Amino acid sequence: MASGKEIKSKIGSIKNTQKITSAMEMVAASKMKRAQERVATSRPYAAKLRTVIGRVAQANLDFTHPFLEEREVKRVGYIVISTDRGLCGGLNSNEFKKVALDIKAWKEKGVSAEFATLGSKAAGFFQRFGGQVLAKKAGLGDKPSIQDIIGPVKVMLDAFSEGKIDRLFLVYNKFVNTMKQEPTVDQLLPLPKAEEEVSAHTWDYLYEPNPDAILEALLVRFVESQVYQGVVENAASEQAARMVAMKAATDNAGDLMDELQLIYNKARQAAITQEISEICSGSAAV
């Protein structure tokens, strides 16, 4: 059994660690609140832009654009959003497992995959995974802007336009609530078909200068907005997962200290009992 001094030292070490995890929990909770506000702000814009593009596309069915064309799938591309830091539970690993299963299904059909990564964890994973990383960006921080993602997004859009990839997907963790974050794979290109309620829309619109020019400008903005939405969703998910992980670590540290304190008390009691026994034995001998 460890000595009382060793046990006390270990309790002190765990207590210091508990202070750190508790502070990290509070910081994550504060950051999560701000990230939730960004999610709530960006969701309506992304949803409305998708609706507008669907309506404009229906206004001119003769308009052709590479982003709207279905073609034989030989290569697929993924824009994968991850965190830059760890200590957020299984957030990244669950996301990577989901996209790995998706890639496996494509490979069984003879389709190869290429990647762009937003976040250092994704870059590291896919370099080890063996995939070709066309673009990567890390250090988006707690307040990402759409300017931060334009570079990697443009690389993947150019690859799609040039026929290097035939489908483009976005992978991120969707923020549901504090306790739940869903790994999500969304198709970006070709542009998914409009939803039924959009197709059933009966209003006619006049577009200036014309639907073609509007759609041309909106398509790139649409992809950028969807990727940015994924970034803010993932940021909120990261802080929620980190808050939960740090709370669990803080609670576990408390339980471990209680166990060690009990061991220390037993060891101290045994030492005192031994000393009393030795004193009594010495008195009897005298």
From Swiss-Prot:
GO terms classed as biological process: proton motive force-driven plasma membrane ATP synthesis
Disulfide topology: none
SUPFAM superfamilies noted in UniProt: ATP synthase (F1-ATPase), gamma subunit (SSF52943)
Chief location bin: membrane
Domain of life according to the entry: Bacteria
Membrane topology: Peripheral membrane protein
Signal sequence range: none
Pfam families, per database record: ATP-synt
CDD domains to which the protein is assigned, alphabetical: F1-ATPase_gamma
Protein keywords: ATP synthesis, Cell inner membrane, Cell membrane, CF(1), Hydrogen ion transport, Ion transport, Membrane, Transport
InterPro entries: ATP_synth_F1_ATPase_gsu, ATP_synth_F1_gsu
Compartments where found: Cell inner membrane
Keyword Ribosomal protein: no
GO cellular component: plasma membrane; proton-transporting ATP synthase complex
An example molecular function term from Gene Ontology annotations: ATP binding
PANTHER family in alphabetical order: ATP SYNTHASE GAMMA CHAIN, ATP SYNTHASE SUBUNIT GAMMA, MITOCHONDRIAL
Subunit structure: F-type ATPases have 2 components, CF(1) - the catalytic core - and CF(0) - the membrane proton channel. CF(1) has five subunits: alpha(3), beta(3), gamma(1), delta(1), epsilon(1). CF(0) has three main subunits: a, b and c.
Family the UniProt entry places it in: Belongs to the ATPase gamma chain family.
Protein role: Produces ATP from ADP in the presence of a proton gradient across the membrane. The gamma chain is believed to be important in regulating ATPase activity and the flow of protons through the CF(0) complex.
Stated name of the protein: ATP synthase gamma chain
Taxonomic lineage: Bacteria, Pseudomonadati, Pseudomonadota, Gammaproteobacteria, Alteromonadales
